[in-house]
Amino acid sequence: TLGDMARRRREILLQLEEEGVLTLNKELEIPVLPQRIAVVSSATAAGYGDFCHQLQHNSGGFFFYTELFPALMQGNQVEESVLAALDRINARINEFDVVVIIRGGGATSDLSGFDTYLLAAACAQFPLPIITGIGHERDDTVLDSVAHTRVKTPTAAAELLIHRVAEVAEHLEELSMRIQQGAYMLLDLERRRLETLQTRIPNLVHRKLADARFSLLAAKKDLLQVTKALVARQSHRLELLQQRIADASPDK
């Protein structure tokens, strides 16, 4: 009954909480650009087709790489099939950013395969963020509770990823504009500095020439004074020498 299913879900969640793994997947960070997506679904499921169509025809033109890891989405073999798909993804863990587990609608009883302890424990401890879109508005499974992010439909899962990439693209565009504006401001500042230098250079040259002319005139004046003093000294010495010669002359 539905009551039994709800009780079983609570028991599994309590067990996972006691084991300390209930929120491990939720604690992972979705990469900045989650564009490499491992999809666990049925190849013939309408939900899988909706998911791929939504990604491929997003209005932003963003690229997404998706790879399907087929699994049964209803029946008694859901647990075994999804676990096998997760094992295959785990073997290539570095090739993907996120895991998306999706299926179309169906009866609530068809979701029982997603309410098992083994599947919930595996997803809770999976090394990549898991996004689930396996039910409708009123459906909530144990898998939904342990997944990083739970949405209602495959289309909503696609929109979540598109929105994430669009946010990053918008941020990068804003950053690019700020860098461009900063570059223009620096160029304008340098242009003004060069213009200022261009107006100052003639004045600087004129002042340097004036200073040099003044220094030259001062040096010329000093040289004349030194020369006059030297000539006067030499003339005085010559006069003294002539006087001595005259005093020593025998004709005197």
What are these regions (language model features)?
Residues 4-110, 115-126:
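Phosphate-binding glycine-rich loops and their immediate beta-loop-alpha structural context
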Residues 38, 100-101, 131-133, 237:
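Structured core elements
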Residues 41-44, 70, 103-104, 132-134, ...:
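Flexible glycine-/small-residue-rich
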